[in-house]
Amino acid sequence: MMTEPRDTSSVRHRPRLFKSFFQGSFACSTACRGEGKRVDLTVSSGHDTLLDKDYARLAAEGLLTARDGARWYLIEEKPGEYDWSTFMPMLHAAENQGIEMIWELAHFGWPAHLDIWQPRFVDSFAAFARAMACLMRDEGYTAPFFTPMNQISFWSWAGAEVAMFNPGVTGRGGELKQQLVRASVAAMRAIREELPAARFVLTDPLVHVASSDNSPAAQEEARQQHNAQYEVWDMLSGRLQPGLGGDATLLDIIGLNYYPDNQWLANGETLAPDNPAWRPLSGLLEEVWHRYQRPILIAETGAEGEARAPWLNSVVEQAGLAMDNGIEIEGISVYPAVDYPAWADDRRAPGGLFGLPDANGSRTVNEPYVLAIRSHQIKFKNAG
């Protein structure tokens, strides 16, 4: 028996927060690897010398909102002294190309003169954030978008549980998480003192952890691992460990980073989409929405090689289902916008819309990926 399609026009969320729903994110990590080598992806991707061209590439595809990084380690090489010479070309290039930017203030890196474990780190980051806000205000901005600390949960795990990169220790992930939350809270308060209308995109991975068997112990372990993804947002909002300074006014836009390997069993085995334990993205988005009731940006998503377009298609489809149910999905940002040598091992990561530059500064275009984005843009425009 055929049924009439459900009319979702009255409940479907209509995104209005950003200049464009489809967006691009530039790889801008400045982490130090275990051997002490700093990996600046803005440099290794060639983006630092191709700012106007790279932003123009996004604009030409209708990606008018983007994420990029203000590299703190370069801006504050000397304590309390800010050299904006690496940032101002980025700001002006974005303006020239009509790109609305979400500026990351710390993406796994910090100035060499600071000890991340000390109280001074928090104070210094807040001072840097304040200086950034003052600069933006002087440049005529009243309500810019910032991400104070990118992916605190992942940074805490990678940097202080498994020593993948700086601070390069093990067994201190919880301690680092609290320190980064303190710094984020202090930075957001400092920014809002200078720019009361500033907005914050608070990014972390969106994951699902399933039980490895049906025993009560395994199910409880999976539940705890799954719910751990919410700790940072709970801390920033003051729900968890309010002594860190968080409160509900700081929990602004939830930024979700979602990749093909973001679902796994509690024993560490990655889930494939055909596994019965796999959860549709729309359900995960609904879970976040009901927990926080905040606007959601899928702040990073992507796959490598030929999987790029099919992965995006699935993410857009699932986001659309969530929006049909009134969930406030405000955008989807593809990552990376341009290819880069992977920060973990220097291999090329062929996941971008555009490839690594040649000697003339030209980048190849991944046609299936770009065509998929264009198709979805048309569909979203027609949907109103």
Annotate each PLM feature.
Residues 69-71:
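Juxtamembrane transmembrane-helix termini
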Residues 2-50, 55, 59-61, 73-384:
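Non-catalytic scaffold segments within catalytic domains of secreted glycoside hydrolases
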